[in-house]
Amino acid sequence: MTSLRPLETSLSIGGRPRRGLVLPPPGVGAGVLLRRGAMALPGRRGFACRGRSAASAAERTKEKKRRDSSKQPLVHLQVCLEHQVKFGEHVGIIGSTKELGSWEEQVELEWTTNGWVCQLKLPGETLVEFKFVIFLVGGKDKIWEDGNNRVVELPKDGKFDIVCHWNRTEEPLELLGTPKFELVGEAEKNTGEDASASVTFAPEKVQDISVVENGDPAPEAESSKFGGQWQGSKTVFMRSNEHLNKEADRMWDTTGLDGIALKLVEGDKASRNWWRKLEVVRGILSESFDDQSRLGALVYSAIYLKWIYTGQISCFEDGGHHRPNKHAEISRQIFRELEMMYYGKTTSAKDVLVIRKIHPFLPSFKSEFTASVPLTRIRDIAHRNDIPHDLKQEIKHTIQNKLHRNAGPEDLIATEVMLARITKTPGEYSETFVEQFTIFYSELKDFFNAGSLFEQLESIKESLNESGLEVLSSFVETKRSLDQVDHAEDLDKNDTIQILMTTLQSLSSLRSVLMKGLESGLRNDAPDNAIAMRQKWRLCEISLEDYSFVLLSRFINTLEALGGSASLAKDVARNTTLWDTTLDALVIGINQVSFSGWKTDECIAIGNEILSWKQKGLSESEGCEDGKYIWSLRLKATLDRARRLTEEYSEALLSIFPEKVMVIGKALGIPDNSVRTYTEAEIRAGIVFQVSKLCTVLQKAIREVLGSTGWDVLVPGVAHGTLMRVERILPGSLPSSVKEPVVLIVDKADGDEEVKAAGDNIVGVILLQELPHLSHLGVRARQENVVFVTCEYDDTVTDVYLLEGKYIRLEASSINVNLSIVSEKNDNAVSTEPNSTGNPFQQKLQNEFSLPSDIEMPLQMSKQKSKSGVNGSFAALELSEASVESAGAKAAACRTLSVLASLSNKVYSDQGVPAAFRVPSGAVIPFGSMEDALKKSGSLESFTSLLEKIETAKVENGEVDSLALELQAIISHLSPPEETIIFLKRIFPQDVRLIVRSSANVEDLAGMSAAGLYDSIPNVSLMDPCAFGAAVGKVWASLYTRRAILSRRAAGVYQRDATMAVLVQEILQPDLSFVLHTVCPADHDPKVVQAEVAPGLGETLASGTRGTPWRLSCNKFDGKVATLAFSNFSEEMVVHNSGPANGEVIRLTVDYSKKPLSVDTTFRKQFGQRLAAIGQYLEQKFGSAQDVEGCLVGKDIFIVQSRPQP
């Protein structure tokens, strides 16, 4: 799956180092990346530490250990490994001290644009041995570095950093006395945790908010937000106008470019300085776009601006003279365009996601920066008489002149370096000079919008009302309490958890205030000062999102220190306090995602559910199950939904960025490393990443509580075959050279797949997403005797990946799934419950329904009373006239259901539960109608010719696809005659909404259900004959989709034998829809019916919609109902009579905290018992196990379809 789950798994098992001895996997490459600008700055002092032999190192280590470790001072060490790994792989450090896992467990490093980074607190005057490893989260295996252990001798105390390269274990380790890399993300917050890892906080790093005694923020000279991200050229101070044409080496490659990408690259080539590059972006964003082009323009702009701000695209002087007010004016125009898009009616969640990534890279346009001569303080500083002449010249030529002629991000970097230089030795320079330069630095950060969170919040204080100021003050106060925790020793982890929670809550409150102020959008007539303040508000709320990333990461680290998932699972029975706190943290994290515009309704629903389940606690029991079981099962559904939200976010980024990053990166000459790691850095830099990590901890704990193995079995059985991985089950997804049996690992499914159509040699499927058991895909797999299981748990999936390419045995039962490598290939590749019916066309269709005489008699009477169509023709039939011969098995079954429904009011189960149900009114457009329409349109000859060709057409060369499209094009334009519409109007009320459904002669048969193979079109009306006719044409045309053609070919059915009738029924507006199997599909227990239930229309169940339904197991004979799963589909499909009858449905976000089936045990039990009674009744009347579809409308159960259960 394209998600936060690891994608690459070709890891071998490495050995454990024992004093320099390692067992690396053979052939492990060591692709080393060289980061630009990685050299230490001038004047940096450090000392080199040579690699030593592990034997001598061990002796010195023993001597060190004899000292009293409790009195040893600490060394703060930041480690950076410059190495590229595959997406999904992680890097860890493991070593000889307890802080490094004592060679047992690695400490995870976190990805940044500068490499893999972690911050450690280690005892001073200690000899440390260590190595780096590569691993997958949840996996047990590691790839170790080659060579001897690395050895470093730490000084007594201090703060240092070291830079390492994979497999270069003999390289000298230089301890630099000041951090080479600015701490990013949680690294700057985790100094209080032993061996805690930093987390990417890539473009938006957050500085601490200092506070003074009265609780107000206190300004200080903090470094800029993107200084530590700088990957441009090293600052060179000039004492004269020595600007050279440094851009001469740049290369632009416009090969293959067109549209927006070409315009951007050509614009960059013609624009040397920053304001001209900003103008290129403004020109692109101000154009009129359709929805897709707008997203492309935003993505290219976001990538381009980020590379400018990080120095990977350099800015130079071009001989012109434009003060920073030029940049500010352009920025205001860009900001206005972005804000108009942000709240546009057609703006998508993806658009908003990218817009938010552009904002931090725009300069400020406050009035002081749009003035004719802005940022004049540096001019006064450059002409001071109390500083040396050479220093004055360097400031004048490197900063002042450059800034006032062609300002760019490099000016802020130069100013940072100069400030560090003049403050390095107190008293070396005039105090007033240092003070003025520090103030100028703050002004420059303000211009570049690169200030810390505190500085940004300070800038909006004047615009907050009284209540807003109170919320801000509360946040600052809680932040001060958290700062005190950072300096406290031996503080209880539970206390730390509570303080972090309080800070998260106050942060969320403050961000809520800002979002409410922004949600009204930008007025067209807004004055310039209001727009400038709006920019500050926007940047503040973005920075608060960034800081929530830091806090949530610290929360997770502290939770792990308390025992993580194991502690949570252990505490369920006796105390849910830690659960409550952790769930509150998750809700806050999801709220931050909502504030950022990503699937807001979904975030709100998930938050409501978590809070509701938390409030319910363990009080609710069901049957013999205690409250812990129902609580866990319900919470599992919502946690899976929350995890799905994060995966969809990462999938969105993967669909948005990689291709465009590659295109524009190549064209602009960006280093390959930056291109390859761009998207992963974006995924790991967002709050969604931390929400995903917290979900993982909670999911693991819930699995332990439930005793879940992570597998879900749709079709039990045993299969032997080579394990292969494909993205989807599609014809052509397997190489034609593969003839032996295969078991597929499948990333995604949409419910439209035919397993055997992708290959007759497919004997088993492992799907990496949740899927309803009784979905169309599940039914087809069962009918095709394909062992089918699903799994979404990362650790289990990781283990499965390791078997790829091996010949394996997949054994799936109702209680467990086993995967194992087998040495000898088994001739019996698959063993499931076989179908006894064989080829459906070897049977007589009229024997499909054998009904008792008490039902046959009412049917015969109904036939005698009705008349067929208009003037005796068969333009349409009443449902009571439908037969297998005239309208197919589905329509005939609906006719039978209408009779059974009239008798069901008198039927009760042994427990006295009524088996009563209703059916919707209906009619049928019979077999032959499509052919008649072809004759009238003059297309019958073309249709017949294409049908003959498709019998022998090949799949591999696309011939089937081409012919299928031609057939559909001919048929989809057909519509039933006017007399059919007139007849149907006599049956249905004038304003009723209808659904037109397929009823082919090749579906709903024992041995060939063809579930979901053909189309149904909901929400049409006879009031609009054209729309109704078009819907009928689509149903007819679905007889010749590629999938339908290949499905019939796989079943040995000639295409000319297939024909289609159309079942027209009143569409219902259900609260719940269900699929019911009257014999348990997992273990074939005839005493148990199993139902899967979804909110709204039943298409959610039939398709491959991601999510799980309510799953109920109901005993026919004793009335016991067991809940096997709670629903977590994100959306329900509904039809409103007040809306247009256009063949479309409305999708609404579901909040299960408001659904009776989730919150009411009694309702769930009664509903399950009614389904069991109805299922048993239908099974008895039809004489075999049934696959039943129906719904609940108010208090009435409707049955819309019943077919033989595969």
Curated annotation (Swiss-Prot):
GO CC terms, sorted: chloroplast
Role this protein plays: May be required for starch degradation, suggesting that the phosphate content of starch regulates its degradability.
Disulfide cross-links: none
GO biological process, one term: starch metabolic process
Protein name stated in the entry: Phosphoglucan, water dikinase, chloroplastic
Gene designation: GWD3
Transit peptide (first-last residue): 1-56
UniProt similarity note: Belongs to the PEP-utilizing enzyme family.
PROSITE patterns: CBM20
Compartments where found: Plastid, Chloroplast
Domain notes: The N-terminal domain contains the alpha-glucan binding site, the central domain the pyrophosphate/phosphate carrier histidine, and the C-terminal domain the ATP binding site.
KW Magnesium (keyword) present: yes
Class of this enzyme: transferase
Additional detail: The reaction takes place in three steps, mediated by a phosphocarrier histidine residue located on the surface of the central domain. The two first partial reactions are catalyzed at an active site located on the C-terminal domain, and the third partial reaction is catalyzed at an active site located on the N-terminal domain. For catalytic turnover, the central domain swivels from the concave surface of the C-terminal domain to that of the N-terminal domain.
Cofactor: Mg(2+)
Quaternary structure and interacting proteins, as annotated: Homodimer.
Region described as Disordered: spans on this chain: 1-20, 52-71
Signal sequence bounds: none
Chief location bin: plastid
Keyword Metal-binding assigned: yes
UniProtKB keywords: ATP-binding, Carbohydrate metabolism, Chloroplast, Kinase, Magnesium, Metal-binding, Nucleotide-binding, Plastid, Transferase, Transit peptide
Species the sequence originates in: Oryza sativa subsp. japonica (Rice)
PANTHER family hit by this protein: PHOSPHOGLUCAN, WATER DIKINASE, CHLOROPLASTIC
